């Protein structure tokens, strides 16, 4: 991902304020509610029968935290996203058979959640930088599919 120094600084500064537990759970939960077909990958998570059930599900929250911790690793390695996500790409492609389009959806949901949490602080410039990052991460996660 090519980010200017200003964009990297904006992404890093905002990410330092992110509560990974809260934002991770909300991001994955929203993905599962807004795009319900993604629930098929989470059969073992128990009750996903309603938006409230999804958003309060402890397994959704725990996996959301895990997802955002991986995203944090990506932010530390923006110059090598494919390398950073190689094993996860392989897992999601070969074992889990996740449609790579879902990575783009998740990235866009993350941007929505960040905008919701940070309001005016999430300026159009910050959003533009994050859109580049989530697109780069989605591309890296889809790499094994190519």
Swiss-Prot record:
<feature type="modified residue" description="N6-acetyllysine">
    <location>
        <position position="59"/>
    </location>
</feature>
<comment type="subunit">
    <text>Heterotetramer of two alpha chains and two beta chains.</text>
</comment>
<protein>
    <recommendedName>
        <fullName>Hemoglobin subunit beta</fullName>
    </recommendedName>
</protein>
<dbReference type="Pfam" id="PF00042">
    <property type="entry name" value="Globin"/>
</dbReference>
<feature type="binding site" description="distal binding residue">
    <location>
        <position position="63"/>
    </location>
    <ligand>
        <name>heme b</name>
    </ligand>
</feature>
<dbReference type="InterPro" id="IPR002337">
    <property type="entry name" value="Hemoglobin_b"/>
</dbReference>
<feature type="modified residue" description="N6-acetyllysine">
    <location>
        <position position="82"/>
    </location>
</feature>
<dbReference type="InterPro" id="IPR012292">
    <property type="entry name" value="Globin/Proto"/>
</dbReference>
<dbReference type="GO" id="GO:0019825">
    <property type="term" value="F:oxygen binding"/>
</dbReference>
<dbReference type="GO" id="GO:0043177">
    <property type="term" value="F:organic acid binding"/>
</dbReference>
<dbReference type="GO" id="GO:0042744">
    <property type="term" value="P:hydrogen peroxide catabolic process"/>
</dbReference>
<feature type="modified residue" description="Phosphothreonine">
    <location>
        <position position="12"/>
    </location>
</feature>
<feature type="modified residue" description="N-acetylvaline">
    <location>
        <position position="1"/>
    </location>
</feature>
<dbReference type="GO" id="GO:0004601">
    <property type="term" value="F:peroxidase activity"/>
</dbReference>
<keyword id="KW-0007">Acetylation</keyword>
<feature type="modified residue" description="Phosphoserine">
    <location>
        <position position="44"/>
    </location>
</feature>
<dbReference type="GO" id="GO:0005833">
    <property type="term" value="C:hemoglobin complex"/>
</dbReference>
<dbReference type="GO" id="GO:0031721">
    <property type="term" value="F:hemoglobin alpha binding"/>
</dbReference>
<feature type="binding site" description="proximal binding residue">
    <location>
        <position position="92"/>
    </location>
    <ligand>
        <name>heme b</name>
    </ligand>
</feature>
<keyword id="KW-0479">Metal-binding</keyword>
<feature type="modified residue" description="S-nitrosocysteine">
    <location>
        <position position="93"/>
    </location>
</feature>
<keyword id="KW-0408">Iron</keyword>
<dbReference type="GO" id="GO:0005344">
    <property type="term" value="F:oxygen carrier activity"/>
</dbReference>
<keyword id="KW-0702">S-nitrosylation</keyword>
<keyword id="KW-0813">Transport</keyword>
<comment type="function">
    <text>Involved in oxygen transport from the lung to the various peripheral tissues.</text>
</comment>
<keyword id="KW-0597">Phosphoprotein</keyword>
<dbReference type="InterPro" id="IPR009050">
    <property type="entry name" value="Globin-like_sf"/>
</dbReference>
<dbReference type="GO" id="GO:0046872">
    <property type="term" value="F:metal ion binding"/>
</dbReference>
<feature type="modified residue" description="N6-acetyllysine">
    <location>
        <position position="144"/>
    </location>
</feature>
<dbReference type="GO" id="GO:0020037">
    <property type="term" value="F:heme binding"/>
</dbReference>
<dbReference type="InterPro" id="IPR000971">
    <property type="entry name" value="Globin"/>
</dbReference>
<dbReference type="GO" id="GO:0072562">
    <property type="term" value="C:blood microparticle"/>
</dbReference>
<dbReference type="GO" id="GO:0031838">
    <property type="term" value="C:haptoglobin-hemoglobin complex"/>
</dbReference>
<comment type="similarity">
    <text>Belongs to the globin family.</text>
</comment>
<dbReference type="InterPro" id="IPR050056">
    <property type="entry name" value="Hemoglobin_oxygen_transport"/>
</dbReference>
<dbReference type="GO" id="GO:0031720">
    <property type="term" value="F:haptoglobin binding"/>
</dbReference>
<feature type="domain" description="Globin">
    <location>
        <begin position="2"/>
        <end position="146"/>
    </location>
</feature>
<keyword id="KW-0349">Heme</keyword>
<keyword id="KW-0561">Oxygen transport</keyword>
